[in-house]
Each structure stands twice: as C-alpha cells, then as structure tokens.
C-alpha cells in the first residue's frame, strides 16, 4: 500500500492543489482515504490511475466547496517545482487568479488544459455531457482571462 500511495501522491497532490488550492492537502487526504477504502471495488487494475483521478477531482471539488477560500499564502508555495522554471510571482498570480474561480471551473481547467484530457474523457470523469464540458471550459477560460493580471 505504501508503494501505491508514494506512486500516486505527486499526481493526486497536483490535482487536489490546483482545484482545492490552500485546502489541497485536505482533499489529497480525503482522496487517499476513499481510494484505500474502496480499492477492493476496482475491477480492472489497469484502470487504477483513471479511477484515482476521478476520486481526486471529486474530492477536491467537494473540499473546495465545503470551506471558505483563504487568500493564498505565498510561503506555502516555496517548495513547488515545475518542469519549466517559472517566476514565483507568476505562480502566486496564477493561484490567486484560480482562487477567484469556482471549484468546478478550476477542475475543468486542470483536466483539459493541464492534464490534456479530451472533452469526452473530461465529460466521463465529471459525469456530464461533452457539450457541458465545452461550455464550462469556455466560461472557465473567460473567467480566468478576466481576472488575470500578470
């Protein structure tokens, strides 16, 4: 079990952090509780990552909805790393902009623009129609662009 959690933790942490923001750790913990409780119900081991992604997104949205968002504390971002070197001020600006969006908008941006899921894949994961994903993505991108002040 420890190896499984270690393997999944970076991805789950990234998804939960992007959607639940400062409550990302809570969402990650809830995700792993749900995964460990329900692992026996997973019929197809090859589907593990998709199954965990679905749980992580849903838990992150639930946690984000359940609590008031606190302003992003820049000191919580110090340990962040990325593939491409980026300015910490930009990271803070992006997180602050994301904090102004609804959890569902953050989720669709993460799934489509960060994870690169297709409309159909995102729709299946979120349990909505592909057209709904398309309209939500448009609204989320528009809302992000309106709030973005680099």
Question: What kind of region is each of these model predictions?
Answer:
Residues 1-14, 21, 36:
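A short, charge-rich alpha-helical start-of-domain segment used by transcription regulators
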Residues 7-10, 18-19, 110-118:
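Short helix-capping/turn signature of helix-turn-helix
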Residues 8, 136-139, 143:
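Residues within the DNA-recognition helix of helix-turn-helix
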Residues 12, 16, 24-35, 122, ...:
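Short, small-hydrophobic-rich alpha-helical interface motif
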Residues 37-44, 54-74, 87:
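Arg/Lys-rich amphipathic alpha helix in sigma70-family domain 2
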Residues 67-99:
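Acidic, proline/glycine-rich intrinsically disordered inter-domain spacer in sigma factors
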Residues 78, 93, 124-125, 142-150:
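C-terminal edge and immediately downstream basic/flexible tail or linker adjoining helix-turn-helix-like DNA-binding
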Residues 99, 103, 107, 115-132, ...:
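Helix-turn-helix DNA-binding module
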């Amino acid at each position: 079990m420890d190896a499984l959690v270690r393997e999944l933790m970076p991805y789950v942490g990234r998804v939960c952090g992007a959607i639940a923001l400062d409550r990302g750790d809570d969402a990650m913990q809830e995700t792993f509780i749900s995964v460990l409780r329900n692992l026996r119900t997973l019929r197809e081991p090859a589907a593990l990552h998709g199954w965990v992604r679905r749980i992580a997104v849903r838990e992150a949205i639930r946690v984000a909805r359940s609590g008031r968002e606190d302003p992003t504390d820049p000191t919580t971002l110090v340990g962040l790393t990325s593939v491409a070197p980026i300015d910490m001020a930009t990271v803070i600006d992006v997180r602050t902009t994301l904090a102004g969006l609804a959890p569902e908008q953050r989720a669709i941006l993460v799934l489509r623009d960060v994870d690169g899921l297709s409309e159909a894949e995102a729709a299946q994961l979120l349990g909505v129609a592909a057209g709904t994903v398309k309209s939500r993505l448009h609204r989320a991108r528009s809302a992000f662009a309106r709030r973005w002040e680099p």
